[in-house]
A protein has these predicted regions:
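ABC ATPase "signature
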Residues: 127-128
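Conserved catalytic motifs of ABC-family nucleotide-binding domains
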Residues: 63
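Conserved ABC ATPase "signature" region
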Residues: 19-37, 146-147
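A short, surface-exposed alpha-helical micro-motif characterized by mixed small hydrophobic
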Residues: 109-111
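Conserved ABC ATPase signature
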Residues: 42-46, 50
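Hydrophobic anchor residue at the start of the ABC signature
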Residues: 56, 84
């Protein structure tokens, strides 16, 4: 996985020596909670949660200020999702990171996002502070999403309320 994590360094910092690249890879693995001695293994030798940490290390090795995360917790069991969310929170706090977080999992969005945009068919239907949207969704679509995510009884989208 060393080559995978170091790939961005080859592109963005090509003057780094091999030993400097390796040091950055080791630091990135430590940062995401993986033992650096594992860096000589292949991706298929890692669990889903470890692979997600490797993906995060690929970004962190470049010392970013902004990270785009597309479904970073999908296909992970609940305990591993919680670990990844905790890692992302810690990295955000430690490095003052801004995230663009794309997810269908509203529980994870609620855990991480300060601001939120709800989209339907490629169009924005609601946006604002996450706490406000979760507390008082304005559109029927957002209400239905919240109900589905949090198992709340609600009328179907498009139903007429009395």
């Amino acid at each position: 996985i060393t080559d995978i994590i170091a790939e961005g360094l080859l592109v963005h910092e090509p003057k780094l020596s091999p030993s400097e690249r390796d040091s950055r890879v080791v630091a990135a693995l430590n940062e995401v909670g993986l033992d650096p001695s594992l860096r000589f293994r292949y991706p298929h030798e890692f669990s889903g949660g470890q692979r997600q940490r490797i993906a995060i290390a690929r970004a962190m090795v470049l010392n970013p200020r902004f990270v785009m995360l597309d479904e970073p917790t999908s296909a992970l069991d609940m305990s591993v999702q919680a670990q990844v969310v905790d890692l992302l929170r810690r990295l955000q706090k430690t490095h003052q990171l801004a995230y663009l977080f794309i997810s269908h999992d509203l529980k994870v969005v609620r855990a991480l996002a300060n601001e939120m945009i709800v989209m339907r068919n490629g169009k924005i239907v609601e946006q604002g502070p996450s706490a406000d949207i979760f507390a008082r969704p304005q559109t029927d679509y957002t209400k239905a999403l919240m109900a589905a995510a949090f198992n709340i009884e609600t009328a179907p989208v498009g139903a007429v309320s009395e």
